[in-house]
């Protein structure tokens, strides 16, 4: 029997003390480029480790109050995505060529080009909020 192969990614829905969510504009991402921060797991890496590594590498950000929020799978490409919900309250700036911009957005201000599925996940995350203590999250 042949085992199915797939990639695994880890992403972060990050809120600050004002209840704004952090999005990155990637140069190589389809559409508008805006999306939830994250990336692929490296061999032997746990999902939370990958999420933290990606945030450090791409924008120099450390997060706290980390909790698994949801996971989802895709058929094309074969991929499993694990999303964490966490908090941070820091200025962010791109540290790699692949990230064009990093900005905090309130939900009504989310960029028009943000994929609909990511917009829905952010809205759901606010509804199921817990740890950060900002408006719209507790």
Model segments located where?
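A structural signal for short, well-ordered beta-strand segments
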Residues: 10-12, 51, 68, 84-86
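Conserved Nudix-box catalytic region and its N-terminal flanking loop in Nudix hydrolases
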Residues: 16, 20-57
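Active-site-adjacent beta-strand/loop module that shapes the phosphate/pyrophosphate-binding cleft
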Residues: 72-93, 103, 125-126
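Conserved N-terminal beta-strand and adjoining loop/helix that marks the start
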Residues: 1-21
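Residue-level preference for beta-strand/loop junctions
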Residues: 6, 32, 64, 78-80
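NUDIX/MutT-family hydrolases
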Residues: 94-126
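A short coil-to-beta-strand element that immediately follows conserved catalytic motifs
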Residues: 61-70
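Charged phosphate-binding loop/patch that engages nucleotide di/tri-phosphates or the phosphate backbone
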Residues: 120-138
């Amino acid at each position: 029997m042949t085992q199915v192969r797939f990639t695994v990614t880890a992403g972060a829905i990050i809120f600050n003390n004002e209840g704004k969510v952090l999005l990155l504009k990637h140069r190589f991402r389809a559409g508008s480029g805006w999306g939830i921060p994250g990336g692929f797991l490296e061999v032997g890496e746990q999902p939370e480790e990958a999420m933290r590594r990606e945030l450090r590498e791409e924008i120099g950000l450390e997060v706290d109050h980390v909790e698994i929020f949801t996971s989802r799978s895709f058929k094309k490409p074969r991929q499993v995505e694990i999303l964490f919900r966490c908090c941070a309250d820091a200025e962010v700036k791109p540290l790699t060529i692949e990230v064009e911009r990093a900005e905090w957005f309130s939900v009504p201000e989310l960029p028009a080009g943000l994929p609909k599925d990511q917009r829905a996940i952010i809205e759901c995350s606010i509804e199921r909020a817990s740890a950060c203590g900002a408006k719209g999250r507790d």
